[in-house]
């Protein structure tokens, strides 16, 4: 066999391996994978590691938060370990449908646009979009944002409704757009330093962050005027058994009082939706 034939043979072999790997991954993203999660005793959840108090990284590198505790409790019922995978939140659905993660679970709001890409569990917590401003700015209502600079997280549900319902906020802010940030942390730093005038953000994040920083008295929390949202877990559309079992675990955890225990730990109240309670 000459060198040319050897090289062609090696190339064909490598190509077959690549196609096989791609085919395997493609199959996994189009299948109901519950038996695989059970046999491997592992599921990978994608999250934004800066989203306090839902799921975030501590100074020692470990992850904590309401969603972290809740997800771990859910999968403990099935003997499955959660692998937490930090992701670029703007690419979350891509990461899910490419098979890099199995679930999106991190203050993930249900929207019509997202329903086209993922299969949602029952909602487990309600949320609201608000605008945070400095009290020193004299911006205390939505109309005060006229010609002001607004910030928002790229890929967030807040930015999505900002775009889809322009009459509420987009049409009045400077340049009819919002400065987009990779994380809320970056946006809050710019708000503190007067590089933006207001920040469109999840109420749950803003309340926790400002209280933890001890600066909540220095900021206004303004209802942005959008409809309230609901947090749920996002799965691939083929993973129906996974979604059914998460819903089942939600209900069981609530009946056992574990859901309320986790809720009290992070919010000081029971945040469960009726879908969880019933």
What are these regions (language model features)?
Residues 23, 68-77, 143, 147-149, ...:
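Extended ligand-binding regions for polar small-molecule ligands
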Residues 18-21:
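C-terminal motif of bacterial Sec signal peptides marking the signal peptidase cleavage site
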Residues 57, 71-79, 158-180, 210-215:
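Ligand-binding cleft/hinge of the Venus flytrap
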Residues 72, 81-144:
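Acidic, polar ligand-binding/catalytic clefts
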Residues 28-107, 256:
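Extracytoplasmic small-molecule ligand-binding "clamshell" domains
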Residues 49, 126-133, 211-248, 267-278:
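Periplasmic-binding protein-like
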Residues 83-94, 177-190, 229:
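Short helix-initiation/N-cap motifs at beta->coil->alpha
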Residues 91, 108-116, 161-164, 189-193, ...:
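A ligand-binding cleft/hinge motif common to bilobed small-molecule-binding domains
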């Amino acid at each position: 066999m000459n060198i040319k034939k050897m090289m062609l043979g090696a190339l064909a072999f490598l190509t077959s391996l690549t196609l096989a790997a791609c085919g395997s991954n493609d199959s996994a993203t189009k299948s109901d994978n519950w038996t695989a999660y059970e046999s491997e005793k592992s599921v990978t959840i994608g999250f934004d590691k800066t989203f306090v108090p839902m799921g975030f990284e501590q100074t020692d590198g470990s992850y904590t938060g309401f969603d972290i505790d809740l997800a771990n409790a859910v999968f403990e019922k099935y003997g499955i370990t959660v692998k937490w995978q930090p992701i670029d939140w703007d690419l979350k659905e891509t990461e899910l449908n490419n098979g890099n993660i199995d679930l999106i679970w991190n203050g993930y709001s249900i929207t019509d646009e997202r329903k086209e890409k993922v299969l949602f569990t029952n909602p487990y917590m309600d949320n609201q979009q608000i605008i945070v401003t400095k009290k020193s700015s004299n911006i205390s209502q939505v109309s005060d944002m006229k010609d002001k600079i607004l910030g928002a997280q790229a890929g967030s549900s807040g930015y999505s409704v900002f775009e889809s319902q322009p009459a509420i906020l987009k049409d009045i802010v400077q340049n009819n757009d919002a400065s987009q940030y990779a994380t809320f942390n970056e946006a809050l730093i710019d708000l503190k330093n007067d590089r933006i005038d207001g920040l469109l953000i999840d109420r749950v994040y803003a309340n926790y962050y400002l209280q933890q920083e001890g600066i909540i008295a220095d900021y206004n929390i303004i209802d942005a005027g959008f409809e309230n949202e609901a947090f749920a877990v996002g799965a691939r559309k083929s993973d129906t058994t996974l979604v059914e079992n998460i819903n089942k675990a939600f209900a069981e955890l609530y009946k056992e009082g574990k859901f309320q225990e986790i809720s009290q730990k992070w919010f000081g109240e029971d945040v469960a939706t009726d879908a969880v309670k019933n």
